[in-house]
């Protein structure tokens, strides 16, 4: 309730979307136009795998066009302990480090860390024992800010209640997302929060006042999306071999250099442990 006794507005966000820059099947402009015309989302986050160039481009395009939904820059970081969403970041987070080091780097960059599709017995998912170790770590920088308590994939459906219970037991914010790799999937999972803006969403995650919602995929629909992803990967591999970078709305055609496999800022970073270039 607000001070005058009225109910505060509730916003809706989908904070896990992929574009053609990683393994999604739609470009930045397509996604923005779809969100504007076909959803009631107030916020979206572009979270390609281990890169932020398309997310930065999406934010700029949305602002320039005056689109309704605000864009948060993010990425889905590949850590050794599972995938984690980095939200509100302005630089890439180094991949393939421990989950605790990854989360600490996200926080050091001013971001929020949300383990994606956790507890599912799959190599890309943070397991309970790993998360419990982080929660017991005396360094608060290693603690996640919430959990992706709803992800519509049918693979994770059997573990959904367990994830919700884990978040509740450990005081972690609920975050629901679509993990969309196709336009039709955007908004199939969502997060509701008091307010409408990105700043209000961030405050809600930090104070644990978010809620998740969504509808699980049917297996047949997911198989269709996987088929499209495989065809897209084949085209990407062909273009890499041919030395071409396609101008397909990924963000690279908005002035961001680098091929699909070597995103910007990767080549110039040093390993923090050895000082050697990677």
Mark where each language-model region is:
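Active-site flanking residues adjacent to catalytic metal/cofactor-binding acidic residues
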Residues: 15, 47, 75, 116, ...
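Aromatic-lined carbohydrate-recognition surfaces of secreted/lumenal glycan-active proteins
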Residues: 114-124
